[in-house]
């Protein structure tokens, strides 16, 4: 008997009982392929180590069989045993360990952390997310007010300083707009009504011109004081700072009373219509613009130029009105013919029968208004205050700008604004000489 041949061993293994085992895995197929190639390569050499090779192949088959693992729901498995119930060692092939679930809509972004699993129901009906704060719907002032209201010790009521910050610029802006409208009206009246006071219907025209002049001066003075009072160095605020410096927290009542006197003095002339001009009862000894000190801060350039422009136009209007009154007075008998000023009243006393008294009152009223306006501007040239007497704190407009705009010198042969004021005073003096009766 010789050595058992390989063919006999393979025949015995084939004739033996068939064992149920799974199909060859990919690793076993690769091992078989490598073994076949190795056998083909060794065909030229004598097979002297057949039993060793058989044992090595058997050990490799046993090792690979112990490392087999099953995949559930796999379609390439032919054995029916692999379609049974899944056990703990089965791994689902549709599980993704790395990639997160991608949301189906942009609104789902941020709902699930990286690597977490979201079901289809979660994506279709997500849980409510935290509300986002819209920056456009809330202004910075709203956040400041909310933070101030939530501050400890704050009862929700706005402090005087906060209300002052919210409303300090509103009156000034409204006053500037009204001043601009007044300047346009006066300029239009100067350009369109020039020479109409000498026409045939001069009585009505002169009466309307007088009313416009007084109303313009009174409105300008009120707006001027409103604008100056809103600056950082208004009389009330200066008195409040002085009270704090002196150790008192209450503002000076004298400055407040002075402001009220300025307000009341603006209503000295109450003009009902174009045919009736009434004067309220006023004390001749009280001079609100000359009593006390006014601490006004310098205004900005645009507001200062607007004030000076309107003031210059008012001076020109006053000159034309007084020149028309002077021309309306005849050489003789002017007391019975000048009926345009018949609406003046002092309290309940009517003076319509004496035109000289009417003109005298009109002159005094205009002079008072012009002096008060000049004193507030800080460049008075008035009959009661000379230039340079006002302190820098009393000027609402810088002296350099006043000299530049009003200036002592005119341009292109025209008199300067200061020259216009002096010419107006000269016209008033000449008119006073005519209507004044010495006692």
Swiss-Prot record:
Polar residues biased stretches: 20-35, 243-260
Keywords recorded for this protein, A-Z: Nucleus, Transcription, Transcription regulation, Virulence
Signal peptide as annotated in the record: none
Gene Ontology annotations for the cellular component aspect, listed alphabetically: nucleus
Annotated Basic and acidic residues bias: 1-18, 143-153
Compartments, record wording: Nucleus
Regions of compositional bias (Low complexity) in chain numbering: 157-172
Positions of region (Disordered): 1-53, 143-177, 239-262
Biological role: Transcription factor; part of the gene cluster that mediates the biosynthesis of pyrrocidines, fungal natural products containing a macrocyclic para-cyclophane connected to a decahydrofluorene ring system that show potent antibiotic activities toward Gram-negative bacteria.
Name listed for the protein in its UniProt record: Transcription factor pydF
Lineage, broadest ranks: Eukaryota, Fungi, Dikarya, Ascomycota, Pezizomycotina
């Amino acid at each position: 008997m010789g050595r058992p041949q390989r063919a006999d061993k393979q025949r015995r293994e084939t004739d033996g009982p068939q064992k149920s085992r799974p199909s060859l895995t990919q690793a076993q197929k690769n091992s078989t392929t490598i073994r076949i190639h190795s056998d083909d390569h060794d065909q030229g050499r004598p097979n002297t180590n057949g039993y060793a090779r058989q044992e090595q192949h058997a050990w490799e088959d046993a090792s690979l069989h112990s490392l087999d693992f099953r995949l559930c729901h796999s379609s390439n498995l032919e054995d029916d045993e692999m379609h049974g119930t899944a056990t703990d060692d089965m791994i689902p092939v549709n599980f993704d360990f790395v990639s997160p679930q991608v949301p189906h809509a942009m609104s789902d972004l941020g709902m699930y952390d990286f690597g977490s699993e979201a079901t289809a129901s979660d994506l279709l009906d997500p849980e409510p997310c935290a509300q986002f704060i819209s920056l456009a719907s809330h202004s910075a002032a709203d956040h400041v007010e909310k933070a101030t209201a939530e501050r400890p010790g704050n009862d929700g009521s706005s402090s005087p300083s906060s209300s002052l910050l919210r409303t300090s610029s509103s009156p000034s802006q409204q006053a500037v707009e009204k001043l601009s409208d007044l300047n346009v009206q006066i300029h239009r009246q100067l350009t369109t009504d020039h020479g109409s006071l000498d026409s045939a219907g001069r009585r009505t025209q002169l009466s309307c011109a007088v009313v416009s002049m007084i109303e313009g001066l009174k409105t300008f003075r009120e707006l001027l004081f409103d604008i100056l009072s809103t600056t950082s160095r208004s009389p009330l605020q200066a008195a409040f700072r002085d009270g704090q410096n002196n150790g008192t927290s209450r503002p000076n009542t004298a400055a407040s009373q002075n402001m009220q006197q300025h307000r009341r003095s603006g209503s000295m002339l109450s003009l009902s219509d174009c045919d009736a001009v009434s004067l309220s009862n006023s004390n001749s000894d009280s001079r609100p613009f000359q009593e006390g000190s006014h601490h006004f801060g310098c205004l900005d350039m645009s507001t200062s130029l607007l004030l000076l422009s309107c003031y210059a136009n008012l001076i020109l209007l006053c000159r034309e009105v007084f020149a028309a009154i002077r021309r309306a007075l005849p050489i003789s008998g002017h007391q019975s013919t000048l009926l345009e000023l018949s609406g003046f009243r002092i309290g309940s006393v009517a003076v319509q029968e004496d035109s000289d008294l009417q003109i005298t009152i009109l002159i005094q009223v205009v002079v008072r208004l012009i002096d008060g306006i000049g004193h507030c501007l800080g460049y008075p040239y008035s009959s009661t205050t000379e230039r340079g007497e006002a302190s820098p704190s009393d000027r609402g407009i810088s002296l350099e700008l006043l000299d530049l705009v009003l200036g002592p010198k005119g341009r292109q042969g025209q008199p300067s604004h200061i020259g216009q004021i002096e010419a107006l005073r000269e016209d008033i003096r000449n008119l006073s000489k005519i209507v004044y009766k010495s006692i």
